[in-house]
Amino acid sequence: RLLELFELDELEDRDNVTMREDELEEVLKGMLDYAYEKGILKENSVVYRDLFDTKIMGLLMPRPSEVIRHFHELYEQVSPEAATDYYYKLSRDSDYIRRYRICKDMKWVAPTKYGDLDITINLSKPEKDPKAIAAAKLAKQSGYPKCLLCRENEGYAGRVNHPARQNHRIIPVTINGSQWGFQYSPYVYYNEHCIVFNSQHVPMKIEHATFCKLFDFVKQFPH
C-alpha cells in the first residue's frame, strides 16, 4: 500500500537496503520530501505535509477492531493500567501524538497564595501558511465530521480546515449505562491527557448525572 501511495510499482535496489533505526520525525520528513519532489504532494506546507504523513501512518495502523480487542484483553487479563499504557504508546508511536512537537510546549509551575499553579503554553499546534488559509476559505463547507472529537474522526482523511485522523483509534466504553468514546488528546496539555466523549452529539451540561459518569469512569480506570 505504501508503494501505491508513492506511485511505485516495485522496490528499487532491494539487495542494497540496510536497516537502521531513525526517529520517526526524520523518517517521515524524508518520505514527505520525496513525495513533494515527485509531485505526489502538491503543496510543501505544514498543513499539507501533516495530511500526507498522517495518510502514511494510517497505512501502518492496526484495524480499529484489533486495537479494541487488544485493549480489552490487557484490561481483563492484566490490568486497566496495562490497557491504557498500550493505548497511549500506540497513540504516540503512530504519530497521532506528535512527540517532536509536544516537546516544544512551555510548561512551568508558578507559586501563588492559593497554591502552585501549573501553566502551559501550547506551541505544538502548527501554524497555517497563507496558501492553506486561502484554500480553507475557498473550500466547500462541510458538516462532516460534526466536530473535532466525535467518533467520525477515526480514519478520516482530513482536509485543509480539518485534521487528518487515519492514524487515530478510539476505544468504546460504557459509562453510567451509555456509550462513550475514550481517546487521548493529540496535543497533550498534561501527561496522558485523555478525552471521553459522548457517542451522540448532545448539549454539554453539568448535572447530577455528570458526577455519576465521572465516578463510573474513575471506577473503571482507577489509576
What are the language-model segments listed below?
Residues R1-I206:
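Active-site microenvironments that recognize anionic phosphate/pyrophosphate groups
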Residues I206-P222:
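Long, well-ordered alpha-helical scaffolding segments within enzyme catalytic domains
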